[in-house]
């Protein structure tokens, strides 16, 4: 894309999210969402093939429908409360429908169908922005209305999301679809804790963004999009092989890596609120996620995947891709667990 | 009739939306769009927003829909689909109109209707002159506030419009 246009469009994506996050007026929330949506469409369509066009269209339609539902219930909230401020006491019906609209934007089950298809149709770097930056705005609004969210609705959606994120990702070999189902499952974890401790949701979001950023960057480093091509990284860049191992374990939520922090904190907060079955179900269905991360690890780092002999002897070229900030990100995605006692400042 | 004018206009508004939502060719859909724009202007006028209603006609119909009409004319197809061309479009149109008419009859018959919020039959659509808004119309004061206190909103909306144009050009550029 033409560089000045690209800069303007990225600026609008960023400012759209910033407007949603920082505003106290419901109209500006809607405007921010629409700015974000409009500006990210050309980023999704960076490559001009029909697959990318179809993915961008699907994304646009679902997000526009969600924005419309949000706008309608903003106006009905205005009818009942007489003011436009984003406060925590919403009309209960408006709160339910706004949660539904924001769940459509996030890709929570049962509105998750667009996530794998859109993520698969676009390039790796666009998928990166889609799965990390685009989650910030809806989650910030859910944070602001978190005290009035209907528990039945949000907990149902979150359990369904974790289950669908787990089972849906099992039969996938395409890395972008795997990351999409991983995103659905992580959103489920985040919304589960939202009613009880929104701070833990922010913690989970932060660690999820760091881990997903690192994963995508490692995939982009060798331009791999399938499991089969990822299994050849031992020959191209051996360092990436071990990093993928550690990162997948972190994504799966295993101690002693940073991915364990949000899961631990969420289960702790849920049990403090006397929910027992829910964190048990969440933890058990998260094992499905761990299974397909393990499969990636197995084919990449632990075995030599079947291939021709000619693919086992490659020239090692220097990587020309600019992987800004990748080493600090890898460190942050794997080694933050010893800093977990710092969370006591929240008390 | 003037007491129920907003109700009547809203019903016809929905019917004109149905007429282009049933997806005929864009030329015929554009006709429904025009009618909807004009009726929307009428609804806004009935709430006292004379300036904004006429803005709808001028900018929305006279600017944006005209451009839409020209681009549709450029992209026209040899056999455009009208509402009676194929059964799917006709069925959707009839479904939409029927749903709207049934809703309107239900509102007119029952005394109190609760769909999302309660309102008493068609009487709630009547605009009484409640409240003393002083010598100035609230709508004109709102527009004045947009350009004085609401500078940030003007910046945001202006930027969004610019981005809309840039995005459309970027998407349709191809190659």
Curated annotation (Swiss-Prot), chain A:
Record GO cellular component, one term: mitochondrial inner membrane
Keyword terms of this UniProt record: Electron transport, Membrane, Mitochondrion, Mitochondrion inner membrane, NAD, Respiratory chain, Translocase, Transmembrane, Transmembrane helix, Transport, Ubiquinone
EC class name: translocase
Annotated EC: 7.1.1.2
Membrane spanning stretches: 3-23, 25-45, 59-79, 96-116, 122-142, 149-169, 178-198, 200-220, 242-262, 274-294, 325-345
Catalytic reaction(s) noted: a ubiquinone + NADH + 5 H(+)(in) = a ubiquinol + NAD(+) + 4 H(+)(out)
Compartments where found: Mitochondrion inner membrane
Transport listed as a keyword: yes
Classification via Pfam families: NADH_dehy_S2_C, Proton_antipo_M
Membrane topology: Multi-pass membrane protein
Keyword Transport set for record: yes
Alphabetical GO biological process terms: mitochondrial electron transport, NADH to ubiquinone; mitochondrial respiratory chain complex I assembly
Molecular-function annotations in GO: NADH dehydrogenase (ubiquinone) activity
Entries under InterPro entries matching the protein: Complex_I_Subunit_2, NADH_DH_su2_C, NADH_UbQ_OxRdtase_chain2, ND/Mrp_TM
PANTHER family attached to this UniProt entry: NADH-UBIQUINONE OXIDOREDUCTASE CHAIN 2
Role played: Core subunit of the mitochondrial membrane respiratory chain NADH dehydrogenase (Complex I) which catalyzes electron transfer from NADH through the respiratory chain, using ubiquinone as an electron acceptor. Essential for the catalytic activity and assembly of complex I.
Subunit structure: Core subunit of respiratory chain NADH dehydrogenase (Complex I) which is composed of 45 different subunits. Interacts with TMEM242.
Family listed: Belongs to the complex I subunit 2 family.
Name the UniProt record assigns to this protein: NADH-ubiquinone oxidoreductase chain 2
Organism: Felis catus
């Amino acid at each position: 894309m033409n560089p000045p246009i690209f800069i303007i469009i990225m600026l609008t994506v960023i400012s759209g999210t910033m407007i949603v996050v920082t505003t106290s007026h419901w109209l500006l929330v809607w405007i921010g969402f629409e700015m974000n949506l409009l500006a990210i469409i050309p980023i999704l369509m960076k490559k001009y093939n029909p697959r990318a066009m179809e993915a961008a269209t699907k994304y646009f339609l679902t997000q526009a429908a969600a924005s419309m539902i949000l706008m309608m219930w903003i106006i009905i909230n205005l009818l009942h409360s007489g003011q436009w401020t984003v406060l925590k006491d919403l009309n209960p019906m408006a709160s339910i429908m706004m949660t539904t609209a924001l769940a459509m934007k996030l890709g929570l089950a049962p509105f998750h169908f667009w996530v794998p298809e859109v993520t698969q149709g676009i390039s790796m770097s666009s998928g990166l922005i889609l799965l990390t930056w685009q989650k910030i705005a809806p989650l910030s609004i859910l944070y602001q209305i978190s005290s009035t969210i209907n528990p039945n609705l949000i907990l149902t959606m979150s359990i369904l999301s974790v289950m669908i994120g787990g089972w849906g990702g099992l039969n996938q070999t395409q890395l972008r679809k795997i990351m999409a189902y991983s995103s659905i499952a992580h959103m489920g974890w985040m919304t589960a804790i939202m009613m009880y401790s929104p701070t833990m949701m922010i913690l989970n979001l932060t660690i999820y963004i760091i881990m997903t950023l690192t994963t995508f960057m490692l995939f982009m480093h060798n331009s791999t999009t399938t499991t089969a091509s990822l299994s050849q990284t031992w020959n191209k860049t051996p360092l990436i092989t071990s990093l993928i191992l550690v990162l997948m374990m972190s994504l799966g939520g295993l101690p002693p890596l940073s991915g364990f922090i949000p899961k631990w904190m969420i289960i702790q907060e849920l049990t403090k609120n006397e929910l027992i079955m829910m964190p048990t179900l969440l933890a058990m269905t998260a094992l499905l996620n761990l299974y397909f991360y393990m499969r990636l690890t197995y084919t990449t780092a632990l075995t030599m995947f079947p291939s021709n002999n000619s693919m086992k002897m490659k020239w090692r070229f220097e990587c020309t891709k600019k992987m800004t900030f990748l080493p600090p990100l890898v460190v942050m995605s794997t080694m933050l667990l010893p800093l977990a006692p710092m969370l006591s400042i929240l008390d | 009739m003037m007491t129920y004018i907003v109700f009547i206009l809203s019903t016809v508004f929905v019917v004109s939306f149905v007429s282009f939502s049933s997806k005929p060719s864009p030329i015929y859909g554009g006709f429904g769009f025009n009618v909807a724009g004009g009726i929307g202007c009428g609804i806004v006028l009935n709430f006292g927003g004379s300036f904004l209603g006429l803005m709808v006609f001028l900018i929305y119909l006279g600017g944006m829909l005209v451009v839409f009409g020209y681009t549709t004319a450029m992209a026209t197809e040899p056999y455009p689909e009208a509402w009676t061309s194929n059964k799917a479009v006709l069925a959707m149109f009839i479904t939409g109109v029927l749903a709207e008419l049934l809703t309107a009859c239900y509102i007119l018959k029952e005394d109190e209707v609760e769909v999302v919020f309660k309102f008493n039959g068609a009487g709630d659509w009547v605009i009484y002159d409640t409240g003393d808004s002083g010598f100035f119309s609230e709508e004109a004061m709102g527009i004045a506030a947009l350009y004085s206190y609401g500078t940030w909103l003007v910046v945001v909306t202006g930027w969004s419009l610019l981005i809309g144009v840039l995005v459309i050009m970027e998407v349709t550029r191809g190659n």
